[in-house]
Amino acid sequence: MRARTIKRIINQSHTDAYDLMLETWQALDKDFAQVIGDAMHDDECPATMELADFFDEYAEVAYPLASNIKCFVRTAHAVLENPNDSDFNKIVALTDICIELGQDLDGVFLDGLNMLKPYAQQYDLSSIANAIRDIREFILVMNDGFAKTRDGINAVRGGE
């Protein structure tokens, strides 16, 4: 699983982990969009309107999350080149934003799964559930990594 690889690398505090995190997020997002799109275009699927609403809610959180992850990665690389307090402040703020968006996305998934539950008897939603499970696992690992990064920066800046 990609999320487990990220967790291992983030725990090693290596900046390549941030690049891998971004690549993994982009792949998971693409996979999720494909799974939802396939279901929406399946004539057998009774929940196409619900899936469209679900994907719209997903996009409202997922795209800002992707943007903030990209900004975090750029800033993390900049800090390696030339560490300064301004970039440290930006990284801490971005970790907080990404953690919050990750939690929001988890809420969107829970709502979406509840919305789709009535259709589970009529239609095989396992591919959607699996894609959601992969992203939720990634979010847990990502948020843990961001929290460790934030706490590490704050500890260093606080003289710990």
What are these regions (language model features)?
Residues M1-E160:
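Sequence/structural signature of long amphipathic alpha-helices
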